């Protein structure tokens, strides 16, 4: 049984196959590959973009979607993860998409399920489909020529599952990664590090990936105000100038903290393209895992 818990679960050849399939799915036409199949979404953390993206992907493939209301679920009343998995499995879904605030939960569920489990984000650990759609966006923009491209990841890197998954995946595809964050947001890493964003860093980048500050994962206040943070790390036109680059963000964007209003409307900012690409990538992932499992 194959699952998608981290980006390491797919090799490079499989990822390129996913990209080819996702490119076909960008036409947004409905398909029947998963007609008669059932996909369950269970999100223990709030989500608008990822949840709706997975559900759109499932429906475009012809699948039925069962969204479990976690606020009313037995898990909120003390049910163990093992019992949650057993009950989910008893419903005989063809795949489950799960998000949880605690790292490792999707892997635990996967050990007790008889269908593929897709990690929709777990704690600070991983968000594999976000990294796949980010690389897909980069790959398409540079027409497949991604090796050696310089990417600067800016923000709350230490607490970001998006950063963790992207660093693994982008490293495998030989992108040149630089991290920019305040010391308390910087992970221990061998990668190039800077503690303040400046125009020289941006001038030396092909891609900027801005991250949201993960305030819900902080045990204490780390900045007197988000405005103080923005002074050092907000992506602004005055820094980007006319540099030929692309700007990514996993969303939701804190405007004028992560990215300025002016840059959000700049043609180099591909946030909405990431959203479109995300549905296509998730279609490719769901199709691959479900049909391989049944083949």
Curated annotation (Swiss-Prot):
Residues that coordinate or bind carbamoyl phosphate: 49-50, 99, 127, 130, 251-252
Database matches in InterPro entries: Asp/Orn_carbamoyltranf_P-bd, Asp/Orn_carbamoylTrfase, Asp/Orn_carbamoylTrfase_sf, Asp_carbamoyltransf, Asp_carbamoyltransf_Asp/Orn-bd
Catalyzed reactions: carbamoyl phosphate + L-aspartate = N-carbamoyl-L-aspartate + phosphate + H(+)
Stored Pfam families: OTCace, OTCace_N
EC number: 2.1.3.2
One GO term describing the cellular component: cytosol
PROSITE patterns from the UniProt entry: CARBAMOYLTRANSFERASE
Database matches in HAMAP family: Asp_carb_tr
Family recorded in the similarity comment: Belongs to the aspartate/ornithine carbamoyltransferase superfamily. ATCase family.
Oligomer and partners: Heterododecamer (2C3:3R2) of six catalytic PyrB chains organized as two trimers (C3), and six regulatory PyrI chains organized as three dimers (R2).
Record's function text: Catalyzes the condensation of carbamoyl phosphate and aspartate to form carbamoyl aspartate and inorganic phosphate, the committed step in the de novo pyrimidine nucleotide biosynthesis pathway.
Protein name: Aspartate carbamoyltransferase catalytic subunit
Organism: Campylobacter jejuni (strain RM1221)
